[in-house]
Amino acid sequence: MMNRIITANLAFLASSLMLAQVQAAEPVYPDQVKWAGLGTGVCASGYRPLTRDEAMSIKGNLVSRMGQWQITGLADRWVIMGPGYNGEIKQGTAGETWCYPNSPVSGEIPTLSDWNIPAGDEVDVQWRLVHDNDYFIKPVSYLAHYLGYAWVGGNHSPYVGEDMDVTRVGDGWLIKGNNDGGCSGYRCGEKSSIKVSNFSYTLEPDSFSHGQVTESGKQLVKTITANATNYTDLPQQVVVTLKYDKATNWSKTDTYSLSEKVTTKNKFQWPLVGETELAIEIAASQSWASQKGGSTTETVSVEARPTVPPHSSLPVRVALYKSNISYPYEFKAEVNYDLTMKGFLRWGGNAWYTHPDNRPTWEHTLLLGPFRGQGEQHPLPVDKRYIPGEVKWWDWNWTISEYGLSTMQNNLGRVLRPIRSAVTGDFYAESQFAGDIEIGQPQTRSAKAAQLRSASAEEVALTSVDLDSEALANEGFGNVSLTIVPVQ
């Protein structure tokens, strides 16, 4: 009986969870809610009445758009009442309705293709960025204008983002409307400014490319020789092992000083090019220019398993090589920066979340770029505008209602367009490696030699070994050893 009760409870819980998933709430974007005066619960084609729960989720926004004693209908004979009624939602009827699209658009910011700035020194890259009218000056100027900053333009043009002066200020740049020649309008001499500063650059490991490769091929350094000797009356299978520390030496030179400001976000392996064996790891969170080269070492072993006839020896030979490679390289680097807008906000409409009407002078900084402000709120969280209190600082619902969703999507997409420059230079590496162990034809030992060795406890041994450890170390082969053991 108890098992049946437990089973029934589990089934009820599972069905409840499934129902909760089916009925999960969807975001309601206030800027897409429209007022319709077509009668109780009547909306235009493509729209439906807003439900009570949906109205509750954006109640503050709806009430702020209503008259003091206004009453507007919702679905299923619910109404929401204006500020004079403290925004009460209750059962009732009204001759007008809050309506919502059947297919709402969330309004995600589009991701535009990267803007690639040619390689150069840091000041060259910055200059190209802040002086580009179409890709930078106009988008950021229009953003400031849409947010409510006054006079984002110069005296010689009636349009936003035109006739703008760009000047170097400290480690950044100031973009501001030209104030020469006089102007007309309230406080028109107080132009809003846009400062671009605190640049940083982050390497993109996956963006690696290279030019023509010059590779030496393998060059013989030394040949190690020995004999694998069997002193017994029976054939012996042996293991001949060459063991050594393999070194790889590498270096790079950088074409432009921008590399001094570029950092790597995560450690990564230098890409393999050609046939030169490399195992190079670039450390994280360091200046790219500071990593000029280095050496890596790994222990390598090569073995062979020949069978040596009785009272015979097999010639053993292994060749040691080195090779080098060089080529020009290029990585892309993401550009990150601070964008600071400063000026007074328009009385006739601004997007600050309190919508002040006393024309306050306001300064606000956005952290732009894929590696700026990681872990913090997105600097332009338009897609979270349906959550009251989540969208800090700016009222994106207001900007969308004022200028249109597509206009704001287009502008914010251009402001957030990824900006990249290039880090270029030349790469060189040298690596050492061993070939396979070669085994020659057996050689029968003389009777005299066998008699001299008969008293030895060793059954197999390496004889006539030609291996100069010191000379090999100078060539990059460390701790070289050649050993032989019988197979057990």
From Swiss-Prot:
Top-level lineage group: Bacteria
Signal peptide boundaries: 1-24
Site positions for Important for heptamerization: 390
Chain spans, region Interaction with glycans from host GPI-anchor: 346-355
Subcellular location, record wording: Secreted; Host cell membrane
SUPFAM superfamilies: Aerolisin/ETX pore-forming domain, C-type lectin-like
Gene3D superfamilies the UniProt entry points to: Aerolysin/Pertussis toxin (APT), N-terminal domain, Proaerolysin, chain A, domain 2, Proaerolysin, chain A, domain 3
UniProt subunit comment: Homodimer in solution; homoheptamer in the host membrane. After binding to GPI-anchored proteins in target membranes and proteolytic removal of the C-terminal propeptide, the protein assembles into a heptameric pre-pore complex. A further conformation change leads to insertion into the host membrane.
S-S bonds: 43-99, 183-188
Gene Ontology biological process terms, A to Z: killing of cells of another organism
Post-translational modification as stated in the protein's UniProt record: Proteolytic cleavage and subsequent release of the propeptide trigger a major conformation change, leading to the formation of a heptameric pre-pore that then inserts into the host membrane.
Organism: Aeromonas sobria
Positions of the record's site feature: Important for oligomerization: 156
Function: Secreted, cytolytic toxin that forms pores in host membranes after proteolytic removal of a C-terminal propeptide, leading to destruction of the membrane permeability barrier and cell death. The pores are formed by transmembrane beta-strands and are approximately 3 nm in diameter.
Positions of the pro-segment in this chain: 444-488
Region named Part of the transmembrane beta-barrel after proteolytic activation of the toxin and insertion into the host membrane: 256-288
Recorded domain comment: The C-terminal propeptide is required for normal protein folding and secretion; it maintains the aerolysin precursor in its soluble form and prevents premature heptamerization and pore formation.
Span list, region Interaction with host N-linked glycan: 69-85
Keywords: Cytolysis, Disulfide bond, Hemolysis, Host cell membrane, Host membrane, Membrane, Secreted, Signal, Toxin, Transmembrane, Transmembrane beta strand, Virulence
GO molecular function, one term: toxin activity
The protein's name: Aerolysin
Family: Belongs to the aerolysin family.
Cellular component per GO, a single term: extracellular region
Pfam families: Aerolysin, APT
